[in-house]
Structure formats: C-alpha cells, structure tokens
Amino acid sequence: MADAGLFIGWGAPVRGREAKGLEVFSEALAYYGRLQQEGVIEGFETAILEPHGGDLQGFVLVRGSEERLAQLRVDDEFVRLSTRASLIVEGVGVIGAALGDGLEATIGTYQQAISELT
C-alpha cells in the first residue's frame, strides 16, 4: 500500500495555449500509465474540478513509496513534463503528500512537535 503521494495541481491554461495544454496533459497521463505498468508507482488518479471560483482546476495524485516518489521528482522526464506544463498552464505545483501508512508517521511528527512546543 502506498505510504506517500505527489499532488500535482494546475490552474487555468495560458490563453492561446489551450490545445498545447491538452497535448502535454495527454503526455503526462501516458507517462504516469507507463510508470504504473513498470511498477515505479502504485497508481495515479486524475481529477478535473468543476468551476468554483478558485485557482485550482485539476490535479493528479500519484501514489507510491516515499523513496520511489523522491526519485521520481528528479527524474529527467518528470522534470521535463513539469517544465512544459508550467509554460502552458498557470499555477503548476508538485506537493508531497502522506497517504496510508505514511499518515501515522506524519501525525506522530506533528504530535511530537506539539508536545515540545506546549
């Protein structure tokens, strides 16, 4: 079971770059699918959000081990796709996330910090 995730979020496409945005989006989904088939990641889920007045328009949640996802963040193709996306979509961000068994360790760290600071 995955203990970590990468939350990859994005906002609105740059005006005039919408078609390229879909092209890079398709490249990214194919890349994540390949990573899943190769066992590099456990899986991924894609969400397109309904209009809500905020900046976030969609995200991909990539699931895997903390170690594998740390390696993925510096993988040449991941960096290339993230760079391409940031040139055609506003507000691209990659954020680490605790999932599954990783939640226990994260909450433990938080609880320890609370006890040290109170």
Describe every region a protein language model picked out:
Residues R63-G64, S82:
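Functionally constrained cores in energy, signaling, and assembly domains
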Residues R80-A98:
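Conserved short beta-strand edge segments in small beta-sheet-based binding/regulatory domains
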Residues Q71-T83:
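Amphipathic protein-protein interaction modules
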